[in-house]
UniProtKB/Swiss-Prot annotation:
The chain crosses the membrane at residues 6-26, 28-48, 145-165, 172-192. It comes from the Bacteria. Belongs to the peptidase M48B family. The keyword Metal-binding applies. Its EC number is 3.4.24.-. It is found in: Cell inner membrane. This is Protease HtpX homolog. It comes from Sinorhizobium fredii (strain NBRC 101917 / NGR234). Keywords: Cell inner membrane, Cell membrane, Hydrolase, Membrane, Metal-binding, Metalloprotease, Protease, Transmembrane, Transmembrane helix, Zinc. GO terms for molecular function: metalloendopeptidase activity; zinc ion binding. It holds the Pfam family Peptidase_M48. Its cofactor is Zn(2+). It is an enzyme of class 3 (hydrolase). The active site is at E131. The lineage of its organism: Bacteria, Pseudomonadati, Pseudomonadota, Alphaproteobacteria, Hyphomicrobiales.
Protein backbone atom coordinates (compact mmCIF):
# COMPACT_ATOMS: atom_id res chain seq x y z
CA UNK A 1 0.00 0.00 0.00
CA UNK A 2 2.87 2.39 0.81
CA UNK A 3 4.32 1.73 -2.66
CA UNK A 4 1.00 2.75 -4.24
CA UNK A 5 0.92 5.95 -2.17
CA UNK A 6 4.50 6.72 -3.12
CA UNK A 7 3.70 6.23 -6.81
CA UNK A 8 0.67 8.53 -6.49
CA UNK A 9 2.81 11.13 -4.74
CA UNK A 10 5.44 11.05 -7.48
CA UNK A 11 2.73 11.34 -10.13
CA UNK A 12 1.20 14.36 -8.40
CA UNK A 13 4.56 16.08 -7.94
CA UNK A 14 5.44 15.39 -11.57
CA UNK A 15 2.12 16.91 -12.67
CA UNK A 16 2.90 20.03 -10.63
CA UNK A 17 6.31 20.23 -12.25
CA UNK A 18 4.74 19.93 -15.71
CA UNK A 19 2.12 22.58 -14.91
CA UNK A 20 4.78 25.11 -13.96
CA UNK A 21 6.75 24.14 -17.07
CA UNK A 22 3.65 24.82 -19.16
CA UNK A 23 3.31 28.27 -17.61
CA UNK A 24 6.95 29.05 -18.34
CA UNK A 25 7.17 27.73 -21.90
CA UNK A 26 3.91 26.27 -23.14
CA UNK A 27 3.94 22.70 -24.47
CA UNK A 28 7.68 22.76 -25.00
CA UNK A 29 8.23 23.87 -21.42
CA UNK A 30 5.86 21.18 -20.21
CA UNK A 31 7.81 18.44 -22.03
CA UNK A 32 11.11 19.76 -20.69
CA UNK A 33 9.60 19.79 -17.18
CA UNK A 34 8.43 16.18 -17.66
CA UNK A 35 11.94 15.09 -18.58
CA UNK A 36 13.38 17.06 -15.67
CA UNK A 37 10.86 15.51 -13.26
CA UNK A 38 11.62 11.99 -14.49
CA UNK A 39 15.34 12.59 -14.05
CA UNK A 40 14.82 14.14 -10.64
CA UNK A 41 12.59 11.28 -9.47
CA UNK A 42 15.23 8.77 -10.53
CA UNK A 43 18.05 10.76 -8.94
CA UNK A 44 16.06 11.38 -5.75
CA UNK A 45 15.25 7.70 -5.34
CA UNK A 46 18.93 6.80 -5.25
CA UNK A 47 20.44 9.93 -3.70
CA UNK A 48 17.88 11.93 -1.72
CA UNK A 49 18.96 10.42 1.61
CA UNK A 50 22.57 11.49 1.06
CA UNK A 51 21.39 14.94 -0.04
CA UNK A 52 19.35 15.47 3.13
CA UNK A 53 22.14 14.24 5.40
CA UNK A 54 24.55 16.57 3.61
CA UNK A 55 22.15 19.51 4.03
CA UNK A 56 22.36 19.07 7.79
CA UNK A 57 26.07 18.25 7.76
CA UNK A 58 25.31 15.04 9.62
CA UNK A 59 28.31 13.01 10.74
CA UNK A 60 28.16 9.22 10.78
CA UNK A 61 29.12 7.59 14.08
CA UNK A 62 29.77 4.04 15.22
CA UNK A 63 29.96 2.20 18.51
CA UNK A 64 33.39 3.67 19.30
CA UNK A 65 32.26 7.26 18.73
CA UNK A 66 28.91 7.12 20.54
CA UNK A 67 28.52 3.78 22.34
CA UNK A 68 25.34 4.64 24.24
CA UNK A 69 23.49 6.25 21.33
CA UNK A 70 24.62 3.57 18.87
CA UNK A 71 23.67 0.83 21.34
CA UNK A 72 20.16 2.26 21.73
CA UNK A 73 19.60 2.18 17.97
CA UNK A 74 21.08 -1.32 17.65
CA UNK A 75 18.88 -2.78 20.41
CA UNK A 76 15.74 -1.10 19.09
CA UNK A 77 16.44 -2.27 15.53
CA UNK A 78 16.73 -5.81 16.88
CA UNK A 79 13.40 -5.40 18.72
CA UNK A 80 11.75 -4.20 15.52
CA UNK A 81 13.30 -6.92 13.35
CA UNK A 82 15.07 -4.34 11.19
CA UNK A 83 18.57 -4.25 9.71
CA UNK A 84 20.92 -1.93 11.58
CA UNK A 85 20.60 1.55 10.01
CA UNK A 86 23.48 3.96 9.64
CA UNK A 87 23.65 6.28 12.64
CA UNK A 88 24.33 10.01 12.37
CA UNK A 89 24.71 13.01 14.66
CA UNK A 90 23.74 16.55 13.66
CA UNK A 91 25.53 19.50 15.21
CA UNK A 92 22.55 21.51 16.44
CA UNK A 93 21.55 22.65 19.93
CA UNK A 94 17.89 22.18 18.97
CA UNK A 95 16.70 18.73 20.15
CA UNK A 96 15.34 16.87 17.13
CA UNK A 97 15.76 13.76 14.99
CA UNK A 98 14.78 12.27 11.64
CA UNK A 99 15.14 9.13 9.55
CA UNK A 100 15.84 8.79 5.85
CA UNK A 101 16.53 6.13 3.23
CA UNK A 102 14.77 4.41 0.36
CA UNK A 103 14.16 1.11 2.23
CA UNK A 104 15.05 -0.61 5.54
CA UNK A 105 18.22 -2.04 3.98
CA UNK A 106 19.46 1.46 3.05
CA UNK A 107 18.27 3.58 5.94
CA UNK A 108 19.79 6.08 8.33
CA UNK A 109 18.73 7.78 11.55
CA UNK A 110 20.04 11.13 12.74
CA UNK A 111 19.78 12.84 16.13
CA UNK A 112 20.99 16.29 17.09
CA UNK A 113 23.56 16.94 19.77
CA UNK A 114 20.87 18.94 21.56
CA UNK A 115 18.64 15.88 21.74
CA UNK A 116 21.40 13.59 23.00
CA UNK A 117 22.41 16.08 25.68
CA UNK A 118 18.97 17.12 26.96
CA UNK A 119 16.89 13.92 26.96
CA UNK A 120 17.12 10.92 29.28
CA UNK A 121 18.24 7.51 28.08
CA UNK A 122 14.62 6.28 27.96
CA UNK A 123 13.44 9.38 26.08
CA UNK A 124 16.19 9.03 23.48
CA UNK A 125 15.12 5.40 23.06
CA UNK A 126 11.52 6.53 22.50
CA UNK A 127 12.57 9.05 19.85
CA UNK A 128 14.79 6.60 17.98
CA UNK A 129 12.05 3.94 18.14
CA UNK A 130 9.72 6.45 16.46
CA UNK A 131 12.28 6.98 13.69
CA UNK A 132 12.74 3.23 13.24
CA UNK A 133 8.96 2.92 12.89
CA UNK A 134 9.14 5.31 9.92
CA UNK A 135 11.80 3.06 8.41
CA UNK A 136 9.74 -0.07 9.04
CA UNK A 137 6.67 1.47 7.41
CA UNK A 138 8.85 2.75 4.53
CA UNK A 139 7.74 6.30 5.22
CA UNK A 140 11.32 7.47 4.83
CA UNK A 141 11.33 7.09 1.05
CA UNK A 142 8.12 9.07 0.66
CA UNK A 143 9.16 11.79 3.09
CA UNK A 144 12.61 12.21 1.57
CA UNK A 145 11.31 12.30 -2.01
CA UNK A 146 8.66 14.80 -0.97
CA UNK A 147 11.26 17.05 0.63
CA UNK A 148 13.44 16.99 -2.48
CA UNK A 149 10.64 17.52 -4.99
CA UNK A 150 8.79 20.14 -2.93
CA UNK A 151 11.95 22.20 -2.74
CA UNK A 152 12.46 21.85 -6.49
CA UNK A 153 8.85 22.88 -7.22
CA UNK A 154 9.25 25.99 -5.07
CA UNK A 155 12.42 26.92 -6.94
CA UNK A 156 10.73 26.32 -10.29
CA UNK A 157 7.85 28.57 -9.20
CA UNK A 158 10.34 31.35 -8.48
CA UNK A 159 12.04 30.63 -11.80
CA UNK A 160 8.68 31.18 -13.51
CA UNK A 161 8.52 34.72 -12.14
CA UNK A 162 11.71 35.72 -13.95
CA UNK A 163 11.28 33.78 -17.20
CA UNK A 164 7.56 33.06 -17.54
CA UNK A 165 6.15 36.51 -18.04
CA UNK A 166 7.60 37.67 -21.31
CA UNK A 167 5.67 37.27 -24.53
CA UNK A 168 8.37 35.63 -26.58
CA UNK A 169 8.63 32.43 -24.57
CA UNK A 170 5.42 30.77 -25.86
CA UNK A 171 3.70 31.25 -22.52
CA UNK A 172 -0.05 30.84 -23.19
CA UNK A 173 -1.21 32.25 -19.85
CA UNK A 174 0.85 35.42 -19.55
CA UNK A 175 1.85 37.13 -16.34
CA UNK A 176 -1.36 36.12 -14.53
CA UNK A 177 -0.51 32.48 -15.14
CA UNK A 178 2.98 33.06 -13.77
CA UNK A 179 1.58 34.54 -10.57
CA UNK A 180 -0.79 31.60 -10.20
CA UNK A 181 2.08 29.15 -10.70
CA UNK A 182 4.23 30.95 -8.14
CA UNK A 183 1.49 30.71 -5.50
CA UNK A 184 -0.33 27.47 -6.29
CA UNK A 185 2.58 25.12 -7.04
CA UNK A 186 4.50 25.59 -3.75
CA UNK A 187 1.21 25.68 -1.81
CA UNK A 188 0.05 22.40 -3.37
CA UNK A 189 3.42 20.81 -2.60
CA UNK A 190 3.06 22.01 1.01
CA UNK A 191 -0.42 20.45 1.26
CA UNK A 192 0.99 17.11 0.11
CA UNK A 193 3.70 17.33 2.77
CA UNK A 194 1.09 18.11 5.42
CA UNK A 195 -1.13 15.19 4.42
CA UNK A 196 1.80 12.78 4.46
CA UNK A 197 3.38 13.92 7.70
CA UNK A 198 0.27 14.37 9.83
CA UNK A 199 -1.15 10.92 9.18
CA UNK A 200 2.15 9.08 9.44
CA UNK A 201 3.36 10.68 12.66
CA UNK A 202 0.54 9.07 14.66
CA UNK A 203 1.30 5.65 13.18
CA UNK A 204 5.01 6.04 13.88
CA UNK A 205 4.30 7.18 17.45
CA UNK A 206 2.25 4.07 18.14
CA UNK A 207 4.68 1.65 16.51
CA UNK A 208 7.63 3.42 18.14
CA UNK A 209 6.02 2.99 21.55
CA UNK A 210 5.61 -0.72 20.83
CA UNK A 211 9.27 -1.03 19.80
CA UNK A 212 10.66 0.71 22.90
CA UNK A 213 7.98 -0.72 25.20
CA UNK A 214 7.13 2.56 26.96
CA UNK A 215 4.68 5.03 25.39
CA UNK A 216 5.21 7.51 28.22
CA UNK A 217 8.92 7.87 27.51
CA UNK A 218 8.11 8.90 23.94
CA UNK A 219 5.35 11.21 25.19
CA UNK A 220 7.78 12.86 27.61
CA UNK A 221 10.34 13.26 24.82
CA UNK A 222 7.79 14.87 22.49
CA UNK A 223 6.86 17.43 25.14
CA UNK A 224 10.49 18.32 25.80
CA UNK A 225 11.41 18.54 22.12
CA UNK A 226 8.35 20.65 21.29
CA UNK A 227 9.11 22.99 24.16
CA UNK A 228 12.67 23.56 22.97
CA UNK A 229 12.35 23.28 19.19
CA UNK A 230 10.63 26.62 18.71
CA UNK A 231 12.85 28.47 21.17
CA UNK A 232 16.18 27.18 19.80
CA UNK A 233 16.73 27.90 16.09
CA UNK A 234 17.84 25.27 13.59
CA UNK A 235 19.56 27.37 10.96
CA UNK A 236 19.94 24.56 8.43
CA UNK A 237 16.22 23.77 8.67
CA UNK A 238 15.35 27.45 8.22
CA UNK A 239 17.36 27.41 4.98
CA UNK A 240 15.71 24.15 3.85
CA UNK A 241 12.06 24.36 5.02
CA UNK A 242 10.94 21.67 2.55
CA UNK A 243 12.61 19.11 4.84
CA UNK A 244 10.73 20.20 7.99
CA UNK A 245 8.19 17.36 7.78
CA UNK A 246 10.98 14.77 8.13
CA UNK A 247 11.72 15.68 11.75
CA UNK A 248 9.91 14.22 14.75
CA UNK A 249 8.89 17.79 15.72
CA UNK A 250 8.74 20.68 13.28
CA UNK A 251 12.16 22.40 13.49
CA UNK A 252 11.10 25.80 12.14
CA UNK A 253 11.16 28.50 14.80
CA UNK A 254 8.17 30.34 13.31
CA UNK A 255 5.92 27.27 13.34
CA UNK A 256 2.99 27.41 15.74
CA UNK A 257 1.68 24.04 16.84
CA UNK A 258 -1.94 25.11 16.41
CA UNK A 259 -1.28 26.38 12.89
CA UNK A 260 -3.76 25.10 10.32
CA UNK A 261 -0.89 24.53 7.90
CA UNK A 262 1.50 22.79 10.28
CA UNK A 263 3.41 19.87 8.80
CA UNK A 264 3.02 17.98 12.09
CA UNK A 265 0.04 17.01 14.26
CA UNK A 266 -0.51 18.96 17.45
CA UNK A 267 2.00 17.71 20.03
CA UNK A 268 -0.57 17.52 22.83
CA UNK A 269 -2.79 15.34 20.64
CA UNK A 270 0.14 13.01 20.02
CA UNK A 271 0.94 12.91 23.73
CA UNK A 272 -2.70 12.18 24.58
CA UNK A 273 -2.74 9.27 22.13
CA UNK A 274 0.42 7.84 23.71
CA UNK A 275 -1.03 8.24 27.21
CA UNK A 276 -4.14 6.32 26.11
CA UNK A 277 -1.88 3.62 24.72
CA UNK A 278 0.00 3.46 28.05
CA UNK A 279 -3.28 2.99 29.92
CA UNK A 280 -4.26 0.20 27.52
CA UNK A 281 -0.91 -1.50 28.10
CA UNK A 282 -1.24 -1.05 31.87
CA UNK A 283 -4.66 -2.70 31.87
CA UNK A 284 -3.13 -5.90 30.53
CA UNK A 285 0.04 -5.84 32.62
CA UNK A 286 0.92 -6.20 36.28
CA UNK A 287 3.69 -3.60 35.84
CA UNK A 288 2.00 -0.40 34.65
CA UNK A 289 3.87 1.95 32.36
CA UNK A 290 5.19 4.95 34.24
CA UNK A 291 6.39 8.38 33.21
CA UNK A 292 10.10 8.75 32.78
CA UNK A 293 11.25 10.02 36.18
CA UNK A 294 14.73 8.61 36.00
CA UNK A 295 17.65 10.90 36.64
CA UNK A 296 19.23 11.82 33.33
CA UNK A 297 22.30 9.73 32.72
CA UNK A 298 25.49 11.32 31.52
CA UNK A 299 25.61 10.62 27.83
CA UNK A 300 28.71 10.63 25.67
CA UNK A 301 28.26 12.88 22.67
CA UNK A 302 30.74 12.12 19.89
CA UNK A 303 33.89 14.25 19.84
CA UNK A 304 33.35 15.83 16.48
CA UNK A 305 35.22 19.08 17.00
CA UNK A 306 31.92 20.96 17.16
CA UNK A 307 31.63 23.98 19.42
CA UNK A 308 29.44 23.77 22.51
CA UNK A 309 27.03 26.48 23.53
CA UNK A 310 27.33 28.55 20.35
CA UNK A 311 24.17 30.13 19.02
CA UNK A 312 24.94 29.37 15.39
CA UNK A 313 26.61 26.38 13.72
CA UNK A 314 29.86 26.83 11.83
CA UNK A 315 29.37 28.16 8.33
CA UNK A 316 29.47 25.64 5.51
CA UNK A 317 29.63 25.91 1.73
CA UNK A 318 25.86 26.56 1.51
CA UNK A 319 25.89 29.50 3.94
Amino acid sequence: MNLVRTAMLLAFMTALFMAVGYVIGGRGGMMIALLMAAGMNFFSYWNSDRMVLRMYRAQEVDERDAPEYYGIVRDLATNAGLPMPRVYVIDSPQPNAFATGRNPQNAAVAASTGLLQSLSYEEVAGVMAHELAHIQYRDTLTMTLTATLAGAISMLGNFAFFFGGNRDNNNPLGFVGVLIAMIVAPFAAMLVQMAISRTREYSADRRGAEICGNPLSLASALRKIAGAAHAIPNYDAERNPATAHMFIINPLSGERMDNLFSTHPNTENRVAALERMAREMSAGSTAPARPDNAVRRSRSVPKTGWGRGGSEPPKGPWS
